[in-house]
Every structure is written in structure tokens, then in C-alpha cells.
Amino acid sequence: LDDDDHVDIELPFQVQYHGELYSEMTISSNGWVSLVPCNIDYFWNMSIPSFMGPKAMLAPFWDDLEVVGQDWIRVYTWHDTVGGRFIIEWSRALNGYDELTEETFEIIIYENSSMPTDSGDNVIDFQYLEIADVDVTKNYSTVGIQSPNNNDGNSIIFNNVYAAGAAPLSNGRAIRFTTMSPQSYVSPLEIETENTPDM
């Protein structure tokens, strides 16, 4: 993709997100996708939720990503039919802040046949191979997901402020969005059979 550009694609399988089905998406050169086709090409990232942002947005690293010394921002897609997943990867995109820092990250959307959920919504992962949130002049980055009506969202980070309990972005980090609750685990208590007071 070119600088501040987007492309519309057909999805290899229907994606259910917030209970709605989608068959296409818009991919932005600036580190986000929207399951609702949109023509937003500006680079300035905002908080989530945001009425001015894309609808049904998945933002693994919404920031000003640049084309410097290369012809395009390398964004790849791959439908892994064996693993039952669709991958969108931004590879070695240059951060617009310094035009030197390389960012490599991806979105993985799992088919329901490979990772089912009770709600039917697809499981979504953000994965980071090489990431550095350096853009001090333009709100750093925005990471999170936004609802189809832009009223709700799950924000991980905006303007270098993390959501409570969120792990910081780092190389090798993965973030999962799912409607499934985690398996509960409570470790067994150790019980002493004899209790004698110390004298």
C-alpha cells in the first residue's frame, strides 16, 4: 500500500463480530482494518471508542506508518486453510515519527471451525514481532477494537496510556480478543492435619 492508503478485500470466510456477519474488509496502511468498508486515509490515530474512527475496527497498531526509501508499505494477507485462520500482516513498516523505526505486526482471525465460541463471534489475535511505540508528537499509537456503531470498544493503549491491567507492547507479545471466558483455575489449599502452638 502507498502512504495513507487503503484497500478493500473480500474475506476468505464470513467473520462474525459483535454478533454481525461480514464478508469484506478495508485494510489501512496505518495499522488497522475495518469490517465495514470505509475511505478513511488520514494518519492521525484517536482513542477507542471514537465516532470519527472506522466502524468495526481492529487496530493492532494504529499510527502514522510511512513509505520512506521504498515504494510501498508491505501489507500481506494469507488464508491458512489448514490452520483455519486469516492473517493480515504489516511487515517492516516505518514509523512516521522518525522514519527509521520498523514495525512488524499482524491480525489473526480464526475460523469458527478451528476455534469455536459460544457466541459465534470469531476469535481475533494481535501479534507483534517487532514493535516500538515511539510517536511522541501524534498520540503515540492506538491499540484495540471498536464496535460496528463506534459506541463501544476495548482499548489497550492510546497516547502511551495503557488500560488497567494491560501488558505493555513488546516484541513477541500477543493479545487475544474473544467472547469466551477463561478457564477458571483455583489451586488446592494445603491443609495441616495437626496444629500445635509454638511455645
Spans of model-derived segments:
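Extracytoplasmic Ser/Thr/Pro-rich, glycosylation-prone low-complexity segments
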Residues: 1-191
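Short, solvent-exposed loop/edge segments of extracellular or virion-exposed proteins
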Residues: 190-198
